[in-house]
Amino acid sequence: WIMGHMVNAIGQIDEFVNLGANSIETDVSFDDSANPQYTYHGVPCDCGRSCLKWENYNDFLKGLRSATTPGNSKYQSKLVLVVFDLKTGSLYDNQANEAGKKLAKNLLQHYWNNGNNGGRAYIVLSIPDLNHYPLIKGFTDTLTQEGHPELLDEVGYDFSGNDAIGDVANAYKKAGVTGHVWQSDGITNCLLRGLTRVREAVANRDSGKGYINKVYYWTVDKRASTRDALDAGVDGVMTNYPDVITDVMNEAAYKNKFRLATYEDNPWETFKK
């Protein structure tokens, strides 16, 4: 999965997919009442990027739905996965459950069209703080109560705080999550970060008894760091330059080992070599 980083304006969806992304990451900011409000990152952000692009969250969802609904004039068949980077740092810990409920209602109405031929992309809810694990239960309970538990088949989870792998496993235990887990690791492209924890996550994924199904690394903008990430065995790389990742994947060393994921590839299934 080539994951376009910080795709917060509707116009950027096409821009990143046309550069080779089959997945996008979108920031979600919340208001004081834990309503998802804007797709907005803010300052500071990755070097070389504008940090200030935004939409109202519900408008973005509608644009995303158009891009991921077969038959729509805006349909992009390659776009199969969306990571919502949930900026819950602005919330009190006791608002996490409420944020999950409200997120579920927004997605149900504006993205999944109340279960009636909505967008088809898989969704990853990425949470920066392990203490905010109740967001997951708020989300899953609400979709079930609204009569659409089947949509949970489309949803996965990620804790993005680079916490110790064991601590992340405990948070999932508390949240009642037993699958659909992506594990992120990384840092802004302005700084360097080694692959120690990525390798640990990959080992957990491949052990057959870990909690991780997929591993992605961010933010990867250079050919050398792309090669390092692929060599470490990641499933996804998040990037500001999808075309760079595409170029590396076409190199002799990688083109027979890796291919771009399609809608037919289950993002919750651990890949067996």
Curated annotation (Swiss-Prot):
Enzyme's top EC category: lyase
Catalytic activity: an N-(acyl)-sphingosylphosphocholine = an N-(acyl)-sphingosyl-1,3-cyclic phosphate + choline; an N-(acyl)-sphingosylphosphoethanolamine = an N-(acyl)-sphingosyl-1,3-cyclic phosphate + ethanolamine; a 1-acyl-sn-glycero-3-phosphocholine = a 1-acyl-sn-glycero-2,3-cyclic phosphate + choline; a 1-acyl-sn-glycero-3-phosphoethanolamine = a 1-acyl-sn-glycero-2,3-cyclic phosphate + ethanolamine
GO CC, any one term: extracellular region
GO molecular function: lyase activity; metal ion binding; phosphoric diester hydrolase activity; toxin activity
Places the protein is found: Secreted
Tissue: Expressed by the venom gland.
Binding positions (Mg(2+)): E25, D27, D85
A Pfam family reported for this protein in Swiss-Prot or TrEMBL: GDPD_2
Cofactor field: Mg(2+)
EC number in record: 4.6.1.-
Disulfides per UniProt: C45-C51, C47-C190
Signal peptide region: none
The family this protein is said to belong to: Belongs to the arthropod phospholipase D family. Class II subfamily.
Entry function: Dermonecrotic toxins cleave the phosphodiester linkage between the phosphate and headgroup of certain phospholipids (sphingolipid and lysolipid substrates), forming an alcohol (often choline) and a cyclic phosphate. This toxin acts on sphingomyelin (SM). It may also act on ceramide phosphoethanolamine (CPE), lysophosphatidylcholine (LPC) and lysophosphatidylethanolamine (LPE), but not on lysophosphatidylserine (LPS), and lysophosphatidylglycerol (LPG). It acts by transphosphatidylation, releasing exclusively cyclic phosphate products as second products.
Full protein name: Dermonecrotic toxin LspaSicTox-alphaIA2iv
